[in-house]
């Protein structure tokens, strides 16, 4: 027979998709530990404001630009401020979930890597929240910033004294920025499109929003980026192969001449 059957070989970089139920329980469990763990410093108001003053002074000592320069861009009209508040309130968590879901079904190897990196980043953030409670700049009188969510809406926070669903003194580091940066890095690593660097617009817009709405200091984002860098240095991304970074369009070489040579040789 001329037809040959060759066993298919598994791609060296291929990774089996983890069981879905286990992953759901793991991710939800880790998030709940973080969510409830950071509530432990919710009542540390005096310390949070002292740390806010320190961070503000550190930024001036480092000659970082004032957060007012970014906020002034959003205060040219009610619409822009409202859009920024909406982005802050609605994009952060759904974008990260969508990122993990897509990786789980399309790039299992990158999913495992991204989940580990995000878990490490979030765990390190929780430690910092507990060790360094920090009031956001919108609460710091010395900053002279507008609480855009309170003035223009929508707001995801209530008064700190009565808000039991969130810890508003967990500003350092900014997981809004840390997660957004990981989403961009993960999608760049997991895809092949020449347009994939555009994913960096997500953390760039997020940085503008969190600073412009006075929810975070520059240092909150800098520390988040540093923690993410450490996690990425320890947890390496999967090697890029056809199975880990998506199928690439391949050119098939014509086999007509080869078949002719085989047939001619067989008749001699």
What are these regions (language model features)?
Residues 32-36, 122-130, 201-214:
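Aromatic-anchored segments of alpha-helical transmembrane domains
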Residues 95-100, 178-185, 202-209:
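Hydrophobic, membrane-inserted alpha-helices
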Residues 2-94, 267-268:
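N-terminal transmembrane-helix/juxtamembrane module of multi-pass inner/ER membrane proteins
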Residues 134-143, 167-171, 205-231:
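Interfacial helix-loop-helix junctions of multi-pass membrane proteins
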Residues 45-54, 104-194, 242-263:
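Membrane-interface loops
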Residues 213-214, 219-268:
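C-terminal membrane module of polytopic membrane proteins
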Residues 92, 176, 220:
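Short, conserved phosphate/pyrophosphate- and ester-handling motifs at nucleotide-, phospho-/glycolipid
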Residues 19, 23, 27, 113-114, ...:
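Residue-level signature of transmembrane alpha-helical entry/exit and packing/kink sites
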């Amino acid at each position: 027979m001329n037809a040959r059957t060759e066993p298919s070989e598994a791609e060296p970089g291929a990774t089996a998709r983890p069981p879905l139920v286990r992953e759901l329980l793991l991710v939800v469990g880790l998030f709940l530990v973080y969510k409830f763990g950071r509530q432990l410093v919710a009542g540390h108001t005096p310390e949070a404001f002292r740390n806010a003053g320190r961070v503000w002074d550190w930024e001036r000592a480092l000659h970082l630009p004032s957060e007012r320069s970014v906020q002034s861009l959003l205060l040219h009209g009610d619409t822009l401020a409202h859009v920024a508040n909406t982005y802050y309130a609605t994009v952060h968590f759904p974008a990260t979930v969508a990122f993990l879901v897509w990786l789980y079904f399309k790039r299992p190897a990158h999913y495992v890597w991204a989940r580990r990196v995000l878990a490490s980043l979030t765990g390190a953030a929780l430690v910092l929240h507990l060790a360094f409670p920090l009031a956001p700049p919108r609460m710091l009188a010395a900053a002279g910033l507008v609480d855009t969510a309170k003035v223009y809406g929508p707001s995801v926070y209530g008064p700190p004294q009565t808000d039991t669903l969130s810890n508003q003194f967990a500003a350092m580091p900014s997981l809004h920025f840390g997660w957004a940066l990981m989403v961009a890095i993960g999608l760049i690593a997991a895809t092949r499109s020449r347009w994939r660097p555009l994913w960096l617009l997500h953390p760039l817009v997020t940085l503008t929003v969190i600073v412009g709405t006075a929810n975070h200091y520059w240092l909150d984002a800098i520390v988040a980026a540093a923690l993410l860098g450490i996690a990425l240095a320890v947890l390496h991304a999967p090697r890029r192969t056809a199975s880990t970074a998506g199928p690439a369009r391949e050119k098939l070489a014509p086999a007509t001449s080869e078949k002719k040579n085989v047939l001619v040789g067989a008749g001699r």
